[in-house]
């Protein structure tokens, strides 16, 4: 919810948010409605890319490294050329594993932010 709202407030025109947790989906929908963003943000329950139509310019996920590695092939298909995948929730020790999987799926690390043993990575899918 908070990532979808931030994307909307930063100018994204259409946002499809997905969370596996039913309560998180409920709360996200309420917060999005309260902030007047329902016309641009939809929230569904499911796995990361379940029900996302077409391709995206940006995909954002705050999940652990194992799941990021698992979904990278699907992200590669769902992300437009020159698109960006922002992945956070990665413990620093797993960053090399994520980078290896990213390269295997056609991504390049563009930026890495580290704080208190956690990492956020911006990956690019280039032409």
Feature names for model-found ranges:
Residues 69-84, 99:
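A short glycine-rich, Lys/Arg-flanked "PGG" loop and its adjoining helix->strand segment in the class I
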Residues 49-58, 73:
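A short acidic, Gly/Pro-enriched loop at the edge of an enzyme's catalytic core
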Residues 11, 33-38, 77-81, 105-107:
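Short helix-capping segments at alpha-helix termini
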Residues 1-48, 52:
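Conserved SAM/SAH cofactor-binding pocket of Class I
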Residues 63, 87-92:
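Short strand-turn motif at the edge of the Rossmann-like AdoMet-binding core
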Residues 107-127:
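Core SAM-dependent methyltransferase catalytic element
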Residues 17, 60, 87:
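Conserved SAM-binding loop
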């Amino acid at each position: 919810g908070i990532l979808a709202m931030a994307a909307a407030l930063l100018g994204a025109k259409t946002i499809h948010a997905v969370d596996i947790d039913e309560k998180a989906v409920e709360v996200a929908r309420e917060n999005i409605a309260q902030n007047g963003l329902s016309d641009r943000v939809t929230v569904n329950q499911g796995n990361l890319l379940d029900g996302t139509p077409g391709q995206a310019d940006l995909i954002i996920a705050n999940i652990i490294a194992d799941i990021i590695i698992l979904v990278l092939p699907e992200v590669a298909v769902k992300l437009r050329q020159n698109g960006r995948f922002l992945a956070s929730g990665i413990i620093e020790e797993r960053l090399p594993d994520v980078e290896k999987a990213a390269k295997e799926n056609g991504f390049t690390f563009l930026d890495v932010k580290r704080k208190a043993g956690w990492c956020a990575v911006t990956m690019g899918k280039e032409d």
